[in-house]
A protein has these predicted regions:
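Short, structured interface segments that constitute the first stable element of a domain
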Residues: 131-174
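Hydrophobic h-region of N-terminal signal peptides that target proteins for export
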Residues: 12-20
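Acidic, serine/threonine-rich low-complexity disordered tracts
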Residues: 24-113, 156-245
Length: 245
């Protein structure tokens, strides 16, 4: 009787192993360069991301640290993740977590999503929003978080042929990234990326309505697939170029 029970247990374990789906994991590294007067491009940050997929669910973690090559650039360390599912070349985020740390200060930002829509927002400690334009509830619910945005623009299957607008909310600011005008060659696929401030900025910045235009670039790899190469974004009046290592 004990032998029969043992055999049943062994068969059950083997069946579970055979039918379990192994996680697919990928780690990517990026360098962030700032365009500085007189100095040109200077590496100011390192980014590491890790993607783990089981069936259609995923976890995507994100870590940013300064290089300390220049003393005056942002010295914050940022870490976080998103959880969600991947379906039909689309990213459906369920949870977002981000922590920023600098010296003895830290801030945690969390979003929970329902049906791929931001439902709850927690920012601790809160930002001082007394001098910036209001971000409405509708503006928030139509958006995604910055890590989801980065995951999308660095993976070719999620850019929808360079014909989409990614609406982003980071817990304070609301902005649009519009992808358009694909330029296709034998070796590359380049989208025009238009960055526009929507809300959560000083009123004069919104009134100025200054639009930043750059390129989102993918290169053809040895398997003839498009892989992210680089993108230029605007942050605090500084041009930042993110390049895949």
């Amino acid at each position: 009787m004990n032998s029969i029970k043992f055999n049943i247990i062994v068969i059950f374990i083997l069946f579970s192993i055979i039918n379990s789906t192994p996680a697919k994991e990928k780690v990517d590294n990026y360098s962030v360069y700032a365009k500085l007067p007189l100095l040109g491009e200077v590496e100011v940050q390192k980014i590491e991301t890790e993607l783990s997929i089981v069936d259609s669910t995923f976890e995507y973690s994100y870590y940013v640290a300064p290089t300390k090559i220049v003393d005056f650039f942002d010295k914050k360390i940022t870490s976080g993740y998103i959880l969600g599912s991947l379906e039909n070349n689309s990213v459906n985020t369920d949870q977002y977590y981000l922590k920023t740390e600098k010296d003895d200060f830290s801030r945690i930002i969390e979003f929970s999503y329902i049906n791929n829509v931001i439902h709850d927002v927690s920012v601790n400690p809160t930002y001082d929003t007394s001098k910036i334009t209001n971000v409405s509830e509708i503006m928030i619910t139509e958006s995604v978080d910055p890590v989801t945005m980065f995951f999308k623009i660095t993976n070719f299957e999620f850019i929808n042929g360079c014909n989409k607008t990614i609406k982003v909310y980071d817990g304070k600011r609301r902005y649009d990234l519009k992808l358009s005008n694909p330029k296709i060659t034998d070796e590359s696929y380049i989208c025009t990326l238009t960055h526009q401030k929507i809300a959560g900025y000083k009123p004069e910045k919104i009134k100025e309505n200054k639009i930043y235009v750059s390129d989102l670039k993918f290169l053809v790899d040895e398997n003839r697939s498009y892989k992210f190469s680089e993108v230029s974004l605007r942050n605090n009046n500084t041009d930042l170029i993110i390049k895949k290592n």
